[in-house]
Structures are given as C-alpha cells and as structure tokens.
From Swiss-Prot:
Binding site residues for Zn(2+): 907, 910, 927, 930
Catalytic activity line of the entry: tRNA(Ile) + L-isoleucine + ATP = L-isoleucyl-tRNA(Ile) + AMP + diphosphate
Motif, 'KMSKS' region: chain positions: 604-608
InterPro entries documented for this protein: aa-tRNA-synth_I_CS, aa-tRNA-synth_Ia, Anticodon_Ile_BEm, Ile-tRNA-ligase, Ile-tRNA-ligase_type1, Ile-tRNA_ligase, M/V/L/I-tRNA-synth_anticd-bd, Rossmann-like_a/b/a_fold
Protein name: Isoleucine--tRNA ligase
Amino acid sequence: MSDYKSTLNLPETGFPMRGDLAKREPGMLARWTDDDLYGIIRAAKKGKKTFILHDGPPYANGSIHIGHSVNKILKDIIVKSKGLSGFDSPYVPGWDCHGLPIELKVEQEFGKPGEKFTAAEFRAKCREYAATQVDGQRKDFIRLGVLGDWSHPYLTMDFKTEANIIRALGRIIKNGHLHKGAKPVHWCVDCRSALAEAEVEYYDKTSPSIDVAFRAVDQDAVKAKFGLPGVSGPVSLVIWTTTPWTLPANRAISLAPDFDYALVQIDGQAVILAKDLVESVIQRIGAAEYTILGTVKGAELELLRFTHPFMGFDVPAILGDHVTLDAGTGAVHTAPGHGPDDYVIGQKYGLETANPVGPDGAYLPGTYPTLDGVNVFKANDIVIELLKEKGALLHVEKMQHSYPCCWRHKTPIIFRATPQWFVSMDKEGLRQQSLKEIKGVQWIPDWGQARIESMVANRPDWCISRQRTWGVPMSLFVHKETQELLPIERTLAAMEEVAKRVEVDGIQAWWDLDPKEILGEDADQYEKVPDTLDVWFDSGSTSYSVVDARPEFAGHAADMYLEGSDQHRGWFMSSLMISVAMKGKAPYRQVLTHGFTVDGQGRKMSKSIGNTVSPQDVMNKLGADILRLWVASTDYTGEMAVSDEILKRAADSYRRIRNTARFLLANLNGFNPATDMVKPEEMVVLDRWAVGCAKTAQQEILKAYEAYDFHEVVQRLMRFCSVEMGSFYLDIIKDRQYTAKADSVARRSCQTALYHIAEALVRWMAPIMSFTADEIWGYLPGEREKYVFTGEWYDGLFGLEENEEFNDAFWDDVRYIKDQVNKELENQKANGIKSNLEAKVTLKYADDANGTIKKLKLLGEEVRFIFITSQFVISEQAGGIDDENIQYNAGNTTVQAVVTRAEGDKCPRCWHYTTDVGKVAEHADICGRCVSNIAGNGEQRKFA
C-alpha cells in the first residue's frame, strides 16, 4: 500500500493549541508598550466621531481586587468595541488621591502631623504614598490588558487638577449654590471630621430604647384641648428615642398634624400618645390598666409647651411630616443639632440648632454638671439615671437596630451641628434642575434612573467641607469677626489667584500663602478657611477638571460613566451635582452600573470567610483573557458570581473558541487572499452559507456590543463556534479541505469562507479576549495593519439570498435532518458501525410538503458529504414509513433514517467506503475520486 499522506492538504499552523496565557500575555504586553499601541490607535482613529468613557477614579490605596478588575475590564471592552465601531474612543485612567484613608496610612507609619513633623511634611508624605499606590495599581490594570494612556493618567493630586478643583468650586460659588451654616452632619469622632453620605455604612448596634415623659407647662390648657378640664393628675407628652445622649439638645417635640392623639389615664397620671400606638406603648411600659379619655388631631396640640425633664427649660410641640407610626409613641424627640429632619423642622419653627458635643464626641463644658466632658456613647447610662431621678423615665430596654458607622473606622458616628460649607440643593434650584437632567440620561440598567431620582429628591444639602490635612483647600477667606465670606467678586478673584499658585506648587501653596499677597491691606480683617474639600468633590468635579481640560477629549463631554451600583450615591451623584451647579447640565449621556462580586454560593467576598478571588492569582494561573471572558460572560446587571469552578468553566469556553480559531488558521495554510480568493458567485453553496452564518452572527454580536450586553456577545460567539461551525460546517469541510486538489476551486472556495470567517471572528473576540485576538491576528494570511485594534468590524461578509433555491431556510432544514440522522448513527455503534464513514444511510420519506427532500436530491452525490457518510440514498415510501421513525416537523415532512454498513472497500486516503477502490491500475488501493484529485482534473463541488 502506498503512503498518500503527502498528497493530502493537512492542516498546519504555528498558532499553538494551548493558550499558555499566563506565560504568553506578558510578552504581548511588552510589545504593546514598546510599540505604543495606545498611541497607534489614537493616530488611526484621529478625526473619527468621539466616544468618551470617563474613568471613575479608584482610590489610590491598596492592591486591586476582583471588583476593580470587573470595572476596568468592562470599560476596556466598551472602549475597544467603540473603536471597532468607528469611534475615536480615548481612555484616560484616573486615581482619587486625597482624603482620609491615605492620611490614616501615613499616620500609622509616621504619626499625626504636628507630632514629629509639620503639616506640610505630612502632605508631602501623603503625596508620596499615593504615588506608590498608583504605580502598583497601574501595573495590575495594565496586566489585565486594559489599553489607555497609562503614561499620562489623571490624578486628583496633579497640580493642574488640584487647581481646577478650586476653580470648579469658584464657579459654583459664582452661581450662588454655596452657603455656610451650623447644620447637623455625619460626624466621625475618630476622623474628627464630617463625612459625606457615601462615607457612611450601616451596621447593627445595640442601643437603649427609652420612653420619656415631658410634663405639660400649662396643664389646664392641654386638658382643655381634649375637652376634659376635670382630669385629675399631671399630663405629659411621651417621646421615644434610641439616642438618650441627644436629649440635652432637645428643643421641641414633633407631632404629625393628621394623626389622632389620645389622652390616656394610667397609674394616676395622663399621658398623650398616638392613638394607633397606645396598646403597644402600654404593653411596653407595663401599665396594669389604662383608659383612653379623649382624642384630638396632632394639629390641635401645636405650640403647647412641655418641660424638659432635666435641662430646666420648656419646649414646644411642633408639627412635622417626618413623624410616623412605625415605632415609638407618635411624638418625636427633636434635637435640631443632631438630625437632618430635626434641623429642617427646627428651621421652620425658628428653633435653636444646639450642639453641646465637641469634635471628640464629648459634651462641651456647661452642658450639664454630670455630663460635661463625657463621651456621648458613654453618657446614655448617665442620662437614663437622670431621667429616673426626675421621675420622667417610663421605660427602658435594649434594642438592636441599624446604625450609621464610619466607612473607614467601622465605629458609630453621630449627627453633630458644626460650622460647615454646603452646596445648597434648593437655594438656586439645583435639586429640580438635577432631576430634570436625570431624565435626559440613559441609565443602564434602567432601574438606575428611579434610584438616583429618589436619592436626589430626598438628599439634604451637600456638606463639602472637611477638617482634614490631606485635601484640596477650599481656598476661601472669611471676616475674622463676622465669619462672612469675602465679597463675591473678590472671593472669585482670590480663588483664581490661589488656583494659579496651586497649578505651579500644588495644594501646599495655599497653606504657605500669606493673605497679604492676595488681599493686601484687607488681610488683617480676614482669615483663611482651614477646611479642605470632600474627596467626593475632587472626583465629582473631574468632568470639568479633567474631561474639559484634557486635549484628547477636544472639548467633548463624557458619553459614559461606568461604575459599581453603589456609585449612584457616590460618584454619579457628586458628578451630577457639580456639573449641574456649574453648567446646568449632566456630565454624562449614559450611566452604566455593574453589580458586586460574590462567591459561587452567592456570598459576599470576605477575607475572614476565605472566599476572595485574587485577580493577580487568576492572571498568574489562567491568564487575563480568562478573567476577561468571565467578566464578559456574566450578566453584570446583578451580582457577579466568581469562584475557581466558575473560572474553570470560563477556561473551558475559551478552549472551544481557541480551537475554532486554530482550525481556521490551520486550514488557511497556503492561502493568499490576494490571489486565491474565490468570487462569491463561484463558491460552493455551503461555503456561502457559512459566510452568511458569520454575517448573521456579526449583526447580532454588534447589536449586543452596542447595547452593552456582553454576555449575549459571548453566548452568540459560543453558539457560532460550537454549533454552526464546530458541529456542522467545520466537520463537513474536512474531507474537501484535506482531499481535494490543493489549488482547486472546491478547496479555495472553502478557504475563502474560512478566511472571511476568521477575519470577522478575530474582531468579535478583540474587545473581550484581547490577547488571543492579537495572537490570532498575527497568524492570519494577507496584508494587514499590525494590530486588530486599529481597524473596524469586518465588512467583507455576504450570504445566500432568500430567493435562492438553496437558501438559509434550506440549510436550517438540512441541519435538523442531520441531527436526527446522527442520532441513528450513534445508535448503530452498538451494532458494530463505529464511524459515520462505515455507514450507508437510507433516508426514507413519505411526503415532502416543504420541498426539502426534493432539494436534497438535487445535491446528487454531494449529499453524502453533508452527512459525512460513505453512501446516502433518498427513498420515497409511497405507502408511508415505519412507526419507528424520526419525526422531522418543518413543513410536516416525516423522515426515517435507516443505517446499514457501507458497501465496498475503505479508501486509505479519504477513508470513504466505495466500490471503485483499486479500479485504476496506477493507484490500485485508492478510490476513483482520490485518483482524480491526485492525478486528474480533481473533483468538482457545487453544493458541499
């Protein structure tokens, strides 16, 4: 027997079967860096329509975690897909560099400013620490395959950015949104600073729950309101609170105007309670008996006065919409200095915003003899004892409830009225304009709109001042005696002068500044405001300080902001507030949010549980492309589950895609698209169908990219590789590809299809599996740009026309019949027919309502190649077919596949069984088809 291996067109490629991504990717990254790939892309896209995804800056502290990876990969997928869609999509990564966490790190290592070194030296160390953190995170982000201007990122501590942050505040002041006030703010006694809403987390805390009686000043007046002048015993209004320590600051009791309030007789006294809460209160305080004497609406009790149990003054009953019947007594202890609702209602009634608590969380001198200097959380017991002594405590018990805590220290915080600077939500219509702007933004997922609308509608004024060392100074001057701001025009001019100096020397320029340098003779009357800006102001103003300022954005506003779903109350909110306050419009056109990562069981990632997944470990073991594929294949609109098992599944999917790409490349061996391409009208019909499949897939994939449905992209890509190609087309063409004459139309038609498919496939992959796409690109035949990322989606795809005889609908029917035939072939393995080529299939049919069988007959001898059998016979059964049949439902056609052993001998070259093996003397051991392909004109293929 002769060796015919050399006569076959066996697949050959240098593209490795194994990805070995962890080893190969770093080399590709080095090439990308050496070539300045990002710069090449920018040059290639110059002049195109822009799409700007503005990077929300991660905090420059610590190593990146899996959540960072999700965020950066999603951004990179969008930027790359937009580039392929014909946009110029520059990506400038950024970092948030000021603020408390960095201060704490520096304090831990060096101590607090003023202890061993000056505040200026402390700031320098903070800057140095932030820079090292940026460098560490940058390396990991680059390792993920994220393309961007990593050599020139934006940092909120860049001198130019710091200066622009000051200018942003100046614009907000000019537009009338800034005001100063003593207002309750979230206050962390450990930070010694006000906290933004985004810096507050909630944890369960056990607190004392108390019911306290405030005795009526004018007993007769209260009794008369209920129409009961003759009631015996004293009358009190009962409040309920879980913060006894705030009672020294009580200045009123709030009632709901429309609630019914009952005068209830218990144990020789009368108490006023919300009627709907009487039973629960009586049960709680343990009264043996009670009688409801009368009821009135809350509005009837307005401005009646009640005596504070121990502070020696009386307070009014006032009306507020914040009163509920969810718990308590229906009468709310109101301390305007210790709560936002209390403050708002206090302003309405002209109440004092009392704040008896210092920045360290201890009562100030003169508060109350037994409370002065005591920490408020330790004072609860003292207050309770005071109430007992005064006979005002009706009940006390412990209760667990959700309590605000500092995001950094995890310790309980307090509401504390302090002199702060605020961006007003309503003074100049910021709230209403923001709500209007929200409606013009596309929110992805769409529930994001309702979420941020609710937050904006209900949020208090934004406290933007902080009492910190490492931050952008507010750069304001106030009068030493009145604390009034420098007149507006002079304030704005002074801020611009400060900004110019900061642009040269950084924020330290403010602290080094002698006011005389700017204010001249008036310097003696004014002092510098020592406060720094909330870090959310830093990042929130980047639409102005970065997007408007960077030349690559060419004055265009950001198209998209993309962050985790917690940023509705964080960066999305602060960015919206600042942009609307400055310019009257939203800083973004689209806002996309992704969920948080959880483990395979849906649990939150936690070092204590030990269920965290390190992106560095994943990249070192599996490669960044596996991590990227996992991100893309997960529906980011909800929680994103990740575990070793889930990543293993991603690796399995990756292998299927890689194997498809390798098959394409290996079978393009020897193909030159410039000389070997077959015109569409001359191609084998099945090959045109395959290219059409790619065209349909591309339309769906591009639509999914456009909608940011990346898991749909992956699913469609997998279906194309595994189902349409892997289990149908690529199997069928192996015979033609390997055995036909190398330069025949039959084979070149096939290679033409593979070439078109590969050109499209590599681009579909590029935004997600960037390293692998770059690798594939290097093995594709033909002249091309150096990188796939500089081009656009492949536009060379075509397909079958609907009015053609052998159109897509026909091939859909064929695929269905083939699936049924394959099941019967599988069944026959038990009868000794081990491979499809050992089989002869007789396809019996009784009717042909949709004409599929008629068309199959027209394929003639080529039909067997579709079913990959040695013989294939189509037989009409006029009397119907056996009951044991395979039902094929399209057009009500019923078919039955009968499998028998193929006739003839096996050809050692093509492995088909045929009766003409050995008929040609010169090639006595191969079939006539193979003889023609070796020594003759070669077989002709029209259909398959």
